[in-house]
Design a protein with these regions (language model features):
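Single conserved hydrophobic/aromatic residue that forms the stacking wall/gate
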Residues: 1-10
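Active-site catalytic loop in hydrolytic enzyme cores
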Residues: 76-156, 169-178, 244-248
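Feature marks short, surface-exposed loop/turn motifs that line or immediately flank catalytic pockets
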Residues: 30-33, 102-104, 238
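CN hydrolase (nitrilase-like) catalytic-core segments centered on the catalytic cysteine
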Residues: 48-69, 135, 141-230
Protein backbone atom coordinates (compact mmCIF):
# COMPACT_ATOMS: atom_id res chain seq x y z
CA UNK A 1 0.00 0.00 0.00
CA UNK A 2 1.30 3.48 -0.82
CA UNK A 3 -0.07 6.92 0.02
CA UNK A 4 1.03 9.74 -2.27
CA UNK A 5 0.78 13.51 -1.72
CA UNK A 6 -1.11 15.42 -4.41
CA UNK A 7 1.76 17.78 -5.25
CA UNK A 8 3.80 14.83 -6.42
CA UNK A 9 1.10 12.31 -7.30
CA UNK A 10 1.96 12.13 -11.00
CA UNK A 11 5.72 12.48 -10.61
CA UNK A 12 6.25 10.03 -7.76
CA UNK A 13 3.56 7.42 -8.32
CA UNK A 14 6.15 5.00 -9.73
CA UNK A 15 8.09 5.03 -6.46
CA UNK A 16 5.21 3.31 -4.69
CA UNK A 17 4.60 0.97 -7.63
CA UNK A 18 8.26 -0.03 -7.84
CA UNK A 19 8.24 -0.86 -4.13
CA UNK A 20 5.37 -3.27 -4.67
CA UNK A 21 2.30 -1.26 -3.67
CA UNK A 22 -0.96 -2.97 -4.64
CA UNK A 23 -3.05 0.09 -3.78
CA UNK A 24 -1.99 3.71 -4.20
CA UNK A 25 -3.98 6.58 -2.75
CA UNK A 26 -3.90 10.36 -3.03
CA UNK A 27 -5.45 12.90 -0.60
CA UNK A 28 -8.68 14.88 -0.76
CA UNK A 29 -9.02 17.45 -3.59
CA UNK A 30 -6.06 16.08 -5.52
CA UNK A 31 -6.72 18.25 -8.57
CA UNK A 32 -7.45 21.68 -7.06
CA UNK A 33 -7.90 23.36 -3.67
CA UNK A 34 -10.08 26.44 -3.69
CA UNK A 35 -12.92 27.95 -1.68
CA UNK A 36 -14.02 30.05 -4.67
CA UNK A 37 -17.10 28.41 -6.17
CA UNK A 38 -17.02 30.34 -9.42
CA UNK A 39 -13.31 29.67 -9.91
CA UNK A 40 -13.95 25.96 -9.42
CA UNK A 41 -16.78 25.96 -11.95
CA UNK A 42 -14.45 27.56 -14.49
CA UNK A 43 -11.51 25.29 -13.70
CA UNK A 44 -12.87 21.76 -13.23
CA UNK A 45 -14.25 19.25 -15.72
CA UNK A 46 -17.07 16.87 -16.35
CA UNK A 47 -16.20 13.37 -15.21
CA UNK A 48 -15.69 12.07 -18.75
CA UNK A 49 -13.22 14.88 -19.54
CA UNK A 50 -11.24 15.19 -16.32
CA UNK A 51 -7.50 14.89 -17.09
CA UNK A 52 -6.58 13.59 -13.62
CA UNK A 53 -9.13 10.81 -13.81
CA UNK A 54 -8.14 9.90 -17.36
CA UNK A 55 -4.43 9.86 -16.45
CA UNK A 56 -4.90 7.69 -13.39
CA UNK A 57 -7.07 5.14 -15.19
CA UNK A 58 -4.27 4.78 -17.73
CA UNK A 59 -1.66 4.35 -15.00
CA UNK A 60 -3.74 1.73 -13.17
CA UNK A 61 -4.13 -0.31 -16.33
CA UNK A 62 -0.52 0.03 -17.47
CA UNK A 63 0.95 -0.84 -14.06
CA UNK A 64 -1.80 -3.31 -13.02
CA UNK A 65 -2.38 -1.56 -9.68
CA UNK A 66 -5.41 -0.24 -7.86
CA UNK A 67 -5.56 3.53 -7.34
CA UNK A 68 -7.75 5.49 -4.98
CA UNK A 69 -7.97 8.99 -6.37
CA UNK A 70 -8.67 10.41 -2.90
CA UNK A 71 -10.99 13.02 -4.28
CA UNK A 72 -11.19 15.45 -7.15
CA UNK A 73 -13.60 18.30 -7.72
CA UNK A 74 -15.99 17.36 -10.52
CA UNK A 75 -18.93 19.15 -12.09
CA UNK A 76 -22.02 17.68 -13.72
CA UNK A 77 -24.03 18.74 -16.75
CA UNK A 78 -25.97 21.20 -14.59
CA UNK A 79 -22.72 22.82 -13.37
CA UNK A 80 -23.16 21.37 -9.87
CA UNK A 81 -19.89 20.67 -8.04
CA UNK A 82 -19.02 17.43 -6.21
CA UNK A 83 -16.11 16.41 -3.98
CA UNK A 84 -15.76 12.88 -5.34
CA UNK A 85 -13.50 9.93 -4.58
CA UNK A 86 -12.73 7.31 -7.26
CA UNK A 87 -11.44 3.79 -6.78
CA UNK A 88 -9.83 2.58 -10.01
CA UNK A 89 -9.13 -1.13 -10.44
CA UNK A 90 -6.06 -2.75 -11.99
CA UNK A 91 -7.78 -2.96 -15.38
CA UNK A 92 -8.12 0.82 -15.48
CA UNK A 93 -11.87 0.80 -14.85
CA UNK A 94 -13.69 2.85 -12.22
CA UNK A 95 -14.61 0.28 -9.57
CA UNK A 96 -16.73 2.75 -7.61
CA UNK A 97 -17.07 6.40 -6.71
CA UNK A 98 -18.17 8.24 -3.60
CA UNK A 99 -19.45 11.78 -3.11
CA UNK A 100 -18.53 13.37 0.21
CA UNK A 101 -21.58 13.26 2.47
CA UNK A 102 -20.69 15.54 5.37
CA UNK A 103 -19.90 19.11 4.39
CA UNK A 104 -17.24 21.04 6.31
CA UNK A 105 -19.45 23.84 7.64
CA UNK A 106 -17.59 25.04 10.73
CA UNK A 107 -16.40 28.07 12.64
CA UNK A 108 -12.98 27.33 14.09
CA UNK A 109 -12.28 30.87 15.28
CA UNK A 110 -13.30 34.45 14.56
CA UNK A 111 -10.83 34.48 11.69
CA UNK A 112 -11.23 30.94 10.39
CA UNK A 113 -14.49 29.46 9.15
CA UNK A 114 -15.62 27.26 6.25
CA UNK A 115 -18.88 26.58 4.43
CA UNK A 116 -18.47 23.70 1.99
CA UNK A 117 -22.22 23.40 1.53
CA UNK A 118 -22.09 26.66 -0.44
CA UNK A 119 -19.66 25.03 -2.87
CA UNK A 120 -20.44 21.32 -3.16
CA UNK A 121 -23.54 19.19 -3.48
CA UNK A 122 -23.35 16.53 -0.73
CA UNK A 123 -23.53 12.83 -1.45
CA UNK A 124 -26.20 10.55 -0.02
CA UNK A 125 -24.85 7.04 -0.56
CA UNK A 126 -22.65 4.92 1.72
CA UNK A 127 -20.11 3.17 -0.52
CA UNK A 128 -18.42 -0.19 0.10
CA UNK A 129 -16.90 -2.21 -2.73
CA UNK A 130 -15.11 -5.50 -3.38
CA UNK A 131 -11.37 -5.71 -4.03
CA UNK A 132 -8.97 -8.68 -4.28
CA UNK A 133 -7.98 -8.25 -0.62
CA UNK A 134 -11.44 -7.59 0.83
CA UNK A 135 -14.07 -4.89 0.96
CA UNK A 136 -13.17 -1.19 1.19
CA UNK A 137 -15.34 1.60 2.57
CA UNK A 138 -14.89 5.07 1.07
CA UNK A 139 -15.15 8.39 2.88
CA UNK A 140 -13.61 11.87 2.70
CA UNK A 141 -12.11 14.15 5.36
CA UNK A 142 -14.91 15.67 7.53
CA UNK A 143 -16.79 12.37 7.30
CA UNK A 144 -14.20 11.21 9.84
CA UNK A 145 -16.14 12.94 12.63
CA UNK A 146 -19.28 10.87 12.04
CA UNK A 147 -18.71 7.35 13.45
CA UNK A 148 -22.07 6.01 12.29
CA UNK A 149 -20.84 6.08 8.69
CA UNK A 150 -17.95 3.75 9.45
CA UNK A 151 -19.96 1.35 11.53
CA UNK A 152 -22.39 1.08 8.60
CA UNK A 153 -19.46 0.36 6.25
CA UNK A 154 -18.05 -2.34 8.52
CA UNK A 155 -21.47 -3.96 8.87
CA UNK A 156 -21.48 -4.02 5.06
CA UNK A 157 -18.22 -5.99 5.18
CA UNK A 158 -15.48 -3.35 4.99
CA UNK A 159 -12.01 -4.34 6.23
CA UNK A 160 -10.31 -1.18 5.04
CA UNK A 161 -11.57 2.36 5.57
CA UNK A 162 -10.26 5.14 3.35
CA UNK A 163 -10.24 8.73 4.60
CA UNK A 164 -8.40 11.00 2.11
CA UNK A 165 -8.30 14.38 3.80
CA UNK A 166 -7.28 18.03 3.85
CA UNK A 167 -7.52 18.80 7.57
CA UNK A 168 -6.67 22.36 8.54
CA UNK A 169 -3.57 22.85 10.66
CA UNK A 170 -5.74 23.94 13.59
CA UNK A 171 -8.07 20.93 13.60
CA UNK A 172 -5.29 18.56 12.56
CA UNK A 173 -3.08 19.36 15.53
CA UNK A 174 -6.02 18.98 17.89
CA UNK A 175 -7.88 15.96 16.54
CA UNK A 176 -6.40 14.21 13.48
CA UNK A 177 -4.41 11.38 15.08
CA UNK A 178 -7.03 10.70 17.76
CA UNK A 179 -9.90 10.49 15.27
CA UNK A 180 -8.11 8.27 12.76
CA UNK A 181 -6.90 5.86 15.45
CA UNK A 182 -10.34 5.77 17.06
CA UNK A 183 -12.07 4.81 13.80
CA UNK A 184 -9.55 1.99 13.33
CA UNK A 185 -9.95 0.66 16.87
CA UNK A 186 -13.72 0.87 17.23
CA UNK A 187 -14.27 -0.79 13.85
CA UNK A 188 -11.44 -3.32 13.94
CA UNK A 189 -10.33 -2.08 10.53
CA UNK A 190 -7.29 -0.81 8.71
CA UNK A 191 -7.51 2.91 8.01
CA UNK A 192 -5.80 4.60 5.07
CA UNK A 193 -5.69 8.36 5.54
CA UNK A 194 -3.65 10.28 2.94
CA UNK A 195 -3.62 13.97 3.83
CA UNK A 196 -2.90 17.25 2.09
CA UNK A 197 0.06 19.20 3.46
CA UNK A 198 1.11 22.84 3.22
CA UNK A 199 -0.11 26.34 2.52
CA UNK A 200 -2.96 26.17 0.03
CA UNK A 201 -4.01 29.83 0.10
CA UNK A 202 -3.71 32.94 2.25
CA UNK A 203 -6.47 31.59 4.46
CA UNK A 204 -5.93 27.84 4.46
CA UNK A 205 -3.03 25.71 5.68
CA UNK A 206 -3.41 21.93 5.69
CA UNK A 207 -1.93 19.70 8.36
CA UNK A 208 -0.59 16.71 6.44
CA UNK A 209 0.50 13.72 8.56
CA UNK A 210 -0.75 11.00 6.21
CA UNK A 211 -1.45 7.86 8.23
CA UNK A 212 -1.85 4.12 7.82
CA UNK A 213 -3.33 2.64 11.00
CA UNK A 214 -3.92 -0.97 12.06
CA UNK A 215 -7.15 -2.38 13.56
CA UNK A 216 -5.38 -2.27 16.94
CA UNK A 217 -4.78 1.48 16.57
CA UNK A 218 -1.08 1.15 15.82
CA UNK A 219 0.35 3.71 13.41
CA UNK A 220 2.01 1.58 10.73
CA UNK A 221 3.24 4.55 8.71
CA UNK A 222 3.12 8.33 9.03
CA UNK A 223 4.45 11.24 7.00
CA UNK A 224 5.36 13.43 9.96
CA UNK A 225 6.55 16.49 8.06
CA UNK A 226 6.52 17.76 4.50
CA UNK A 227 5.52 16.07 1.28
CA UNK A 228 6.16 12.52 0.15
CA UNK A 229 4.90 8.95 0.21
CA UNK A 230 4.41 6.39 2.96
CA UNK A 231 3.92 2.64 2.68
CA UNK A 232 2.85 -0.29 4.86
CA UNK A 233 1.92 -3.96 4.58
CA UNK A 234 -1.55 -5.01 5.74
CA UNK A 235 -2.05 -8.35 7.50
CA UNK A 236 -5.67 -9.44 7.22
CA UNK A 237 -5.09 -12.55 9.31
CA UNK A 238 -4.21 -10.17 12.13
CA UNK A 239 -7.40 -8.19 11.44
CA UNK A 240 -9.54 -11.32 11.79
CA UNK A 241 -7.70 -12.25 14.98
CA UNK A 242 -8.34 -8.83 16.50
CA UNK A 243 -12.02 -8.94 15.56
CA UNK A 244 -12.39 -12.42 17.04
CA UNK A 245 -10.64 -11.51 20.29
CA UNK A 246 -12.30 -8.10 20.64
CA UNK A 247 -15.85 -8.63 19.30
CA UNK A 248 -17.32 -5.15 19.03
CA UNK A 249 -19.92 -5.98 16.37
CA UNK A 250 -22.31 -7.86 18.64
CA UNK A 251 -26.00 -7.00 18.77
CA UNK A 252 -26.16 -3.75 20.68
CA UNK A 253 -27.67 -3.74 24.14
CA UNK A 254 -28.85 -0.18 23.64
CA UNK A 255 -31.25 0.24 20.74
Amino acid sequence: LGLVGSEMCIRDRNKAIDKGAFLISTPEVTNIISLDRQKLKRSVFLEKDDPFLIEFTKIAKKKSVWILLGSIVIKDNKNKLYNRSYLINSKGNIQCKYDKIHMFDVKISKKESYKESKIFKPGKKVVVTNTPWGKIGLSICYDLRFPELYRKQVMMGAKLITIPSAFTTTTGKAHWHNLVKTRAIENGSYVLAPAQYGKNSLKRHTYGHSLIVSPWGEILAEKKAGKGIIMASLDFKELHKIRANMPSFRTQILK
